[in-house]
From Swiss-Prot:
Entry's Gene Ontology BP terms: carbohydrate metabolic process
Location of the active site: 204, 414
Signal peptide feature range: 1-26
Protein name: Beta-glucosidase 7
Entry's EC annotation: 3.2.1.21
Lineage of the organism: Eukaryota, Viridiplantae, Streptophyta, Embryophyta, Tracheophyta
Keywords assigned by UniProt, alphabetized: Disulfide bond, Glycoprotein, Glycosidase, Hydrolase, Secreted, Signal
UniProt source species: Oryza sativa subsp. japonica
Key word Hydrolase present: yes
Molecular function per GO: amygdalin beta-glucosidase activity; beta-D-fucosidase activity; beta-galactosidase activity; beta-gentiobiose beta-glucosidase activity; beta-glucosidase activity; beta-L-arabinosidase activity; beta-mannosidase activity; cellobiose glucosidase activity
Length: 504
């Protein structure tokens, strides 16, 4: 009997172990060269590793807790705008599950969490009345992060303008946004700044200008041919200008009113895809540089040098707003560090420049995107049609910023890849392609750091599968799988890869 009971116990233990392995996903994944020579110790001593999300993509409670609607609420609730007519009303419900998510970060050995504050959760109308229930939520999240030893990196704006400000003032087309944003930022600095020491003003303002005012696919859906009206040749430049002035005003407020006592820093998050010349021809080389100037230079040149890139001034001419001397002084040097969201790369094919009839910001580049060279793709494609997996693009971006802009402090604020929506749970959990993605991109980042690039941290996008904007829930960027029927979280192989890599 004793032997039989022992055998039964052994069978039970083995069965439980198999179930645990199946649930973890990573435990059953083959691990040849699992870490690829990477470890925490391979990076600089104070280098920060974290994960990132944004408010509308994960919080839920969109119409509850005193929150006012944002432009994304109105957009997602309009049929036909988002895949499957999905929205962020519930998302991953981090509003109620933040402790579970913070505990997950801690178990995976992350140092920091980059999240955004929903402006309309603090100010339901974008200005005036404060929603104390929203303030309490962010206080609770920040306090719990610190309790668990995780550093908050707080982004003040991630696409989600309060709808009231769009309706009342016309949103980012109105120069008054600088004052409105500064008052919102001031409240956040005053309320949370005794615990938050790492701030970002905006996430990807270029994307807002491109998709919201040039192509018209995202809110507020303005473009030359859009039903809502707009001008793709002028409005993107006006919006970008107002973002830069709003950023500079908020940073000036922090530096004069709070920085001495709080000892924090404020940066901005910019997207940067690497552009490689298709050939050594003069036209292709010039096209690649032009693309970099119209992409990252649009924001970094003013922030570092106080003016827009010369090629933009030459091609865009009087459609490009001008900084007054006082504005240029405020904008120049207004970022304590630069956040870079880096995902992909493409080849650039050039042409002889010509003075053409202005049609759009995109057309002003006068380049052709190419994704293969001599019949060889630039890299495998992830689920998103824009996302080619090109690890050396990470090196290209970081090294370029070092060389062109005097090696400012950079934080990689997003980096990741997505899976499609038609996989089984087991396939989601066994995300070996994502493991390879992170291993190869971090290897290229380490190479740039070893060569002198001033990079202070890295944030994986994203902690959770979440609401991925136009794609709704059909695009899965998380290192943690979310069952959107139950909202249960299950770490993927990539999550365990980070856990193991960050142990040493």
């Amino acid at each position: 009997m004793a032997a039989r009971r022992a055998n039964c116990a052994l069978v039970l233990v083995l069965a439980l172990a198999l179930l645990a392995a199946r649930d973890a996903g990573a435990a059953a994944v083959p691990k040849p060269n699992w870490l690829g020579g990477l470890s925490r110790a391979a990076f600089p001593k104070r280098f920060v590793f974290g994960t990132a999300t944004s408010a509308y993509q994960v919080e839920g409670m969109a119409a509850s807790g005193g929150r006012g609607p944002s432009i994304w609420d109105a957009f997602a609730h309009t049929p036909g705008n988002v895949a499957g007519n999905q929205n962020g009303d519930v998302a991953t419900d981090q509003y109620h599950r933040y402790k579970e998510d913070v505990n997950l970060m801690k178990s995976l050995n992350f140092d920091a969490y980059r999240f955004s504050i929903s402006w309309s959760r603090i100010f339901p109308d974008g200005e005036g009345r404060v929603n104390q229930e929203g303030v309490a939520y962010y206080n609770n999240l920040i306090n719990y992060l610190l309790q668990k030893g995780i550093t908050p990196y707080v982004n003040l704006y991630h696409y989600d303008l309060p709808l009231a400000l769009e309706k009342k003032y016309g949103g980012w087309l109105n120069a008054k946004m600088a004052d409105l944003f500064t008052e919102y930022a001031d409240f956040c600095f005053k309320t949370f700044g005794n615990r938050v020491k790492h701030w970002f003003t905006f996430n990807e303002p270029r994307i807002v200008a491109l998709l919201g005012y040039d192509q018209g696919t995202n809110p507020p859906k303005r473009c030359t041919k859009c039903a809502a009206g707009g001008n793709s040749a002028t409005e993107p430049y006006i919006v970008a200008h107002n973002f830069l002035l709003s950023h500079a005003a908020a940073v000036a407020r922090y530096r004069t009113k709070y920085q001495a006592a709080q000892q924090g820093k404020v940066g901005i998050v910019l997207d940067f895809n690497w552009y490689e010349a298709l050939s050594n021809s003069t036209e292709d080389q010039a096209a690649a540089q032009r693309a970099r100037d119209f992409h990252i230079g649009w924001y970094l040149d003013p922030l570092i040098n106080g003016h827009y890139p010369q090629i933009m001034q030459d091609l865009v001419k009087d459609r490009l707003p001008k900084f007054t001397p006082e504005q240029a002084r405020l904008v120049k040097g207004s970022a304590d560090y630069i956040g870079i969201n880096q995902y992909t790369a493409s080849y650039m094919k050039g042409q002889q420049l010509m003075q053409q009839t202005p049609t759009s910001y995109s057309a002003d580049w006068q380049v052709t995107y190419v994704f293969a060279k001599n019949g060889k793709p630039i890299g495998p494609q992830a689920n998103s049609n824009w996302l080619y997996i090109v690890p050396w693009g990470m090196y290209g971006c970081v090294n370029y910023i070092k060389q062109k802009y005097g090696n400012p402090t950079v934080v990689i604020t997003e980096n990741g890849m997505d899976q499609p929506a038609n996989l089984s749970r087991d396939q989601y959990l066994r995300d070996t392609t994502r493991v390879h993605f992170y291993r190869s991109y971090l290897t290229q980042l380490k190479k740039a750091i070893d060569e002198g690039a001033n990079v202070a941290g890295y944030f994986a996008w994203s902690l959770l599968d979440n609401f991925e904007w136009l794609s709704g829930y059909t695009s899965k960027f998380g290192i943690v799988y979310v069952d959107f029927n139950t909202l249960e979280r299950h770490p993927k192989a990539s999550a365990y890869w980070f856990r193991d890599m960050l142990k040493h």
